[in-house]
């Protein structure tokens, strides 16, 4: 039975997103705990974040069958992974962050708009780095 288009595929995508977000939140919480002097708590957050990464990787391994959850492009081999990464970063710098910056500015959140515009520039740089890496692969 095909995974593509199934509820299981959507569940894997949702679980991947949740585990990925948990990883980043826990690393952020660990940094905060470090600043506050709670090194033992920071270590708990970091080790748990590592576990969440393993869970996310497991979901992504199953999703190789259906494509990148962010772009829908094929993933697995490095060349495909780079193409999916380029597409994702390109979307972020051409559509996502500019749109978010406009909304933030329209709502009077100029500092956040500036942040989003800065991130768009960073994402363009990421896309360019991935493109260079793709161009350097032996085909």
Can you say where each PLM-predicted feature lies in the sequence?
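Non-heme di-metal
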Residues: 1-139
């Amino acid at each position: 039975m095909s995974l593509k288009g199934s509820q299981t595929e959507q569940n894997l995508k949702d679980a991947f997103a949740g585990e990925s977000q948990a990883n980043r939140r826990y690393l952020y919480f660990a940094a905060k705990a470090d600043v506050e002097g709670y090194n033992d708590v920071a270590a708990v957050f970091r080790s748990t974040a590592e576990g969440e990464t393993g869970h996310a990787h497991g979901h992504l391994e199953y999703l190789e069958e259906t494509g990148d959850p962010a772009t829908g492009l094929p993933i697995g081999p490095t060349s495909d992974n780079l193409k999916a990464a380029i597409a994702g970063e390109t979307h972020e710098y051409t559509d996502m962050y500019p749109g978010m910056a406009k909304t933030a500015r329209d709502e009077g959140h100029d500092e956040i708009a500036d942040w989003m515009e800065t991130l768009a520039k960073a994402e363009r740089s990421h896309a360019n780095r991935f493109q260079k890496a793709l161009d350097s692969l032996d085909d």
